[in-house]
Amino acid sequence: MFDVFTRVVSQADARGEYLSGSQLDALSATVAEGNKRIDSVNRITGNASAIVSNAARALFAEQPQLIQPGGNAYTSRRMAACLRDMEIILRYVTYATFTGDASVLEDRCLNGLRETYVALGVPGASVAAGVQKMKEAALDIVNDPNGITRGDCSAIVAEIAGYFDRAAAAVA
């Protein structure tokens, strides 16, 4: 797992080069948006239970077969596993957002997840739909201008959306 700074320095070091002006500019922008990044992570973390439960509720309303007898979320044990998995994906999205790098999400959460779901008979499209619902809820919370560092947050919002999209694509 690398943060954005470690990744840039490692890449330059591997090439035996100094950091370029564009790399320094990108790192400066990351520092400048640091409070917005922390605010976004705090907001998602503070609302994690609601994000997960509302996304699951919406998913099961759209796909009621999941919670009916024989469905992949039928029985409290399977429902708990589904909610746990959604929470884990959301948690790793916050880690990626905080570090500004998707490697923690990829390496520790998404790597092999599709294969695991296939082996367990879990419908990947349903998991992807749940991830998209979490994305919508999280972005609504992050985009709320009240009580957050003022300024343009569009880059962070796009970054967060990209992490959710990456997670949805990994399980679909």
Curated annotation (Swiss-Prot):
One of its GO terms (cellular component) is plasma membrane-derived thylakoid membrane. Disulfide bonds: none annotated. Heterodimer of an alpha and a beta chain, which further assembles into trimers. The trimers assemble into hexamers, although these were not seen in the crystallographic studies. Part of 2 PBS rod complexes, the conventional CpcG-PBS rod and a photosystem I-specific CpcL-PBS rod, both of which include ferredoxin--NADP reductase (petH). Interacts with rod linker CpcC2 via the latter's N-terminal PBS-linker domain. This is C-phycocyanin beta subunit. Belongs to the phycobiliprotein family. (2R,3E)-phycocyanobilin 2 binds at C153. Light-harvesting photosynthetic bile pigment-protein from the phycobiliprotein complex (phycobilisome, PBS). Phycocyanin is the major phycobiliprotein in the PBS rod. GO terms for biological process: photosynthesis.
